[in-house]
Amino acid sequence: MSERTLRRPASLAEVAGRPLAGGTDLVPLLQDGLVEADALADVRELLPRGVEGSRIGAGTTLAELERSEEAPGALREACRLAASPQLRHMGTIGGNLLQATRCWYWRLAFPCFLHGGDRCHAREGEHREHAIFANDPCASAHPSDPAAALLACSATILTDRRRLALPELYRLPTDDDRSLTTLEDGELILEIELAPPDDSVYLKAMDRRRFSFPLVGVAAARYGDDVRLGLSGVAPIPWQLDSPEELDRATPLPGTAYKVEIARALVRRALEAVRA
């Protein structure tokens, strides 16, 4: 990582440079040259922190959410399964929602679609951990466990500029815009507001028993007779599943067909759990 300036602004109005909070995702990306920043702005002390009723400060760590009695069960479990204890104590919920893809072609700086190239190398190459929905022109899979839980819990994002429903935070990449979020330059997530469910659960399939990114993650949140589903690891962005039958319309690549069956099983188990 080349030398760069680290600023500690006294207020949000003074933030200039790339925002840095927990740094568990950003710092490795900077070290690997996958993102560029001449200056970093340490915003950790400026972000709201903690859980108050239905509002969560973006600076709240995953470890704090995991222990919070006010957070929905699905979110607590998603935070518990998201990373090692060290990373959970550093990583913030706001940063976790903005995680970069784990796609190895992108991480190895192949000239892939997300890097401005004309094709997705994973589609014709190794893609066992990639997407089963919306996987053309990019087959990357979003790695955030908490994002799936917040999607099921109908979360709303409050930034320093606007308010938007969680699905509006994300976008699928196009030829004109390869980014995966709708945040503008310098825009900061400040708080997350959710609708507390009657019951919720998060289930996850991963290669290792602990501290691995999701092959498939399924969150279910029940509101009366209605159950909302959010999935991780199945699309370039956190994926809202309108019904279990939507899995019939998945478009897996040859190496990801197994994910459809895992998703079916986890959705069935999640629905049974919140309806019990």
Walk through the language-model features, giving the residues of each:
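C-terminal structural segment of proteins
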Residues: M1-A276
